[in-house]
């Protein structure tokens, strides 16, 4: 199925041929206008109406139309030719001329500049047309450039070499068709001359020869053109529509198919509209580059069910029909063996001091050269971006590994880095930030930054200082020295370090000499060796020169940092507040990133730490990281402008002075960041001054004057283990500002900006903030985001929060206010379309939610090895938005099920899901963080929790409760140990809880059933319990781990078991949360699963009662001590069908708004013999299928169709089966206080709701033996119902309470006590036989009342008294005893007056004598006959009632409210 298709509206589909014959006088009747000399395609002007038009060989065809572009004339490609050449071709034709023309469109119009400004895939029709245009242009034109001639180049032949002014003048005059920059130099393609030189016109034969493709026919200057051609090859992933033209032009190198000369020339970029408007002032900026496999590479056919297609703009993309997705990447490229990064060479194979841009990039990498954000690299395979050249990065890492291996056998002595070593990594000159218009590289525009090796040539103030080396070094950081011709300058000072205490150093000072050794021209590695040789306690003399500002952004993560902390021999290195010892050599090599492209860029697009996720060997903690987490003192010089200094200040929330609240004028405040603490203003300490005093001091500075600020950056307080020691109240005063994003340093990078680290599995701390912060603190968009916005919408981006996926449909633009986190918005959601093929077992996922109006629908359990699991894109917790294009937001669960059933018939489904995007967003100081894990808190990756099976009887979503500060609360902010927002102040801490032998831990944990991304939190702390006494827990705190075991992706039951298995001591890892949100959830009885850690003393005589969850309620479990004999809460049984079925019956189902419960166990049946199942246990899965929202009939069908075996997953109940409450409607059975399930146990011998129950034999209508025996348990009327005891519900302490009193109500007892008091009625399933006396008593009762009962049955349908008795109210308020007395009174009324007055003594005596006269054998025979007769009557009544029940279930005929719904029994099925 590998084929190439094109969009119907692509211009190639509009191309047509037309043959025009000359008239009698030789006239053609077609006017040709335009031409390259006018910057236009040749196009058709006026056309004579009488001219014939047709295809060669006869036949009618489309006619030429005015305005159509001419692509070929008589087989000669004329695009890019001047008009006089086109007319020459036409004149050379004799009788007829064949034209190939196309109608103009939005992409292809007569403007040559517009078309050349676009980028297309190599080999596409658009790319070929561009090459034709350039071929034809170079017949008459010579490209121009501002660079100096190279050896062998001939001016006027290879290039026209111009000055920058001449070039800009030429561009402004409109003479150039293409303009661009490459390596800091301007290149342009001029228009051909308006008249042919010397009157010569290229003949048709010559054009045919030139366009034949032979290298011998190529003009001499095509050498330069070949460079341009190779440099202009780009991949369609960088393709963009006309609305973003500045991203569409690039001239970068493709080393895949060039000879040894090509890349050195790589010139002549296409025109860029942004350059036309304003020339680029940073010549080091480049444009995107991608290295697709060239046409010469033998990739073979596309994989099965893949096809290649073109967009209407000529962009190539690939369609995967297996998953119904599209991709820009060629799948053959992904499968091709990749060359290791460190083995990629420059095109000549020799390492010289060539630019990194001349290094070969591996397949799948793209180099982006953005006019605004500088140069960065995109790894399309691993979905990540970074500023550093990946080849250089890999080479450096390999070199570091080799050095470390060499140093392992002996004490590490750093190898001296010479220029020969440094040349292995091509040096790059420093760059300039965007605010500095001066270029970084040597160009005709501006020279390279001043450098000298002679100290006498330095201009500025010389400073001498002497520093004593402490155990932590000298206390300053150095940048620069990436190449020999670069200064080493002071970046920042470490707070309280020797340099800061000395007070002489400032940011930007150039290090001239160290101990009288001139270091001008030294590399950073050489300086490392010098500083390392100085022992601790010794002093060093430094000579500095002030007056040279840093020529690049010091906070660029690619900038090399040389710090005194890292270059000490076996000195303690402070890393994240802990002292460690490391090799000085390894640290000297880890002092930062060897510079790649330190061009102007506002922020880093990549987290340069987490190198292990790059697929490269992971370094140890980098030096820059260790320094970045320490307080730094930075000197900033700001000139006061007409509107002030360009920043605002506010009181520091933690005290200590004034902090920078907001950067208003970032170019003016270069080097200053939001959150910086102002220490000094013009050498005067202002930390003790008030806010107004500092403001007045700044106001007094005259406009135009320079102010020197000493600011402290970083050094945030580290919290103790217990959050009790930290003030949790948030400080919201007008003069109090919170930290900005940039003021919080990541533990993994020296950059204050949170860069992008994109992998399918990611840590949220490494995910990008929605917008980054540049060196001046202002919000800047992510460069990858800018790049991704230039993409077409054909590809489904992955769901991981990569910069590309951050632009997926449905994602909101989010803005982080760096001055007030009270307004900070948690990143929103992103959507994705997922196409799944159905397997034999289904689509492989389950659906939750949709039970209430407006309730979201979520993806539940992902079945292992199912279709969804194999595809890998769908996750538990994803919100379902659409099913096959049908929106399901706010729809019912049933509708989604129906849609999925329809999709199952088709064999595939297209799902649109929405997933919350979690980024690392630092919070303000003293702000209560959301209970979420972060890189501070736990080692496990934080992700959306995948609930394998949440066995709670609930489906509804747990709504996120906002704490009012813009952050989500504990319940809705993360999964069990899952993702959330990062707290910069509060960290997770461990809490150990010990309990006594006769007590529980004393806490309730809350887990969201239908919101897998919600965490597991404390819902209640029991007063006086061990949890309360420890003083470290509060409601809302979230649990991250139990006894060191992460609960990420663990279900509620797994967490329960972890705590239960802990014994008398449990250690919990906690992150503080929000108490109010959880309290609200508990009091509102939300559908959450709770666990009570109470414990019943073993001395208690009665067993503690445990109720089972009812639908849409809380489920509670107890943690009993190990000495308490009880079974696990959850268990699995596998039953084999017996002669009469599986031996159990069910109650419940979705149609009754109940979960499924075990109602009865057949005597000596398989279920009873297995020894695990008990009455009241909740059935969670049947043969692997969840019972959530399962109908009663579906459960029967699963069991019957499962063959000889059935596998059940159950949750232990308390022996009571919940009743159905018809008044609750969709709210399910009534709940008790605090959402505790209310259970009204009745005599287990009665059957509360036959309509909700089923038992299962293969013989559907045969009654089992135990059913026959149960027939005598009916009341005198044959009613097998028992009414609930209305106001009794069991607590978790095993006690019950009566809220109402009734005169005839039996004494309240727990189920065990009930069974103890009535042994003959303990077994609901009839597992215990009644005593012979009780059976004989039942026989006599049946014998005496059968006739009267049969007569009464015929009348009770019309009896008003009966109807009243059957009302729900009467049913609720009547106990079995009261019903029996009422029945006796009713029967008594039917007797004759004589009988009501009481029979005569003689009659009573005769009756007694007759009973005495009967033999035991006769009584047993009569009893057996009567039982058989009763069973037949009851069976017939149940069948009739079942039919009535089905009719009453119809939506069009709802059951009458006065009649008792679901009373009558449907056919009892024995399993």
Swiss-Prot record:
GO MF annotation terms: ATP binding
Ranges of Polar residues composition bias in the record: 578-594, 931-943, 951-960, 1092-1110
Gly residues biased stretches: 967-977
PROSITE patterns tied to this protein: GUANYLATE_KINASE_1, GUANYLATE_KINASE_2, PDZ, WW_DOMAIN_1, WW_DOMAIN_2
SUPFAM superfamilies with a match to the protein in the record: P-loop containing nucleoside triphosphate hydrolases, PDZ domain-like, WW domain
Tree of life domain: Eukaryota
Cell membrane found in the keyword field: yes
InterPro entries listed in its UniProt record: GK/Ca_channel_bsu, Guanylate_kin-like_dom, Guanylate_kinase_CS, P-loop_NTPase, PDZ, PDZ_sf, WW_dom, WW_dom_sf
GO BP, sorted A to Z: endothelial cell morphogenesis
Chain intervals for the UniProt region annotation (Disordered): 233-261, 395-455, 578-615, 712-753, 764-783, 792-813, 925-977, 1092-1123, 1212-1471
Domain Guanylate kinase-like: 96-287
Biased composition, class Basic and acidic residues, residue ranges: 1259-1319, 1334-1376, 1383-1471
Ranges for domain WW: 300-333, 359-392
Any one Pfam family match given in the protein's UniProt record, by short name: PDZ
Tissue and organ expression note: Widely expressed, including kidney glomeruli.
UniProt KW keywords: ATP-binding, Cell junction, Cell membrane, Cytoplasm, Membrane, Nucleotide-binding, Nucleus, Phosphoprotein, Repeat, Tight junction
Ranges of residues in domain PDZ: 17-105, 464-546, 635-713, 833-915, 990-1074, 1132-1214
Reported function: Plays a role in coupling actin fibers to cell junctions in endothelial cells, via its interaction with AMOTL2 and CDH5. May regulate acid-induced ASIC3 currents by modulating its expression at the cell surface.
Name this polypeptide is given: Membrane-associated guanylate kinase, WW and PDZ domain-containing protein 1
Organism annotation: Mus musculus (Mouse)
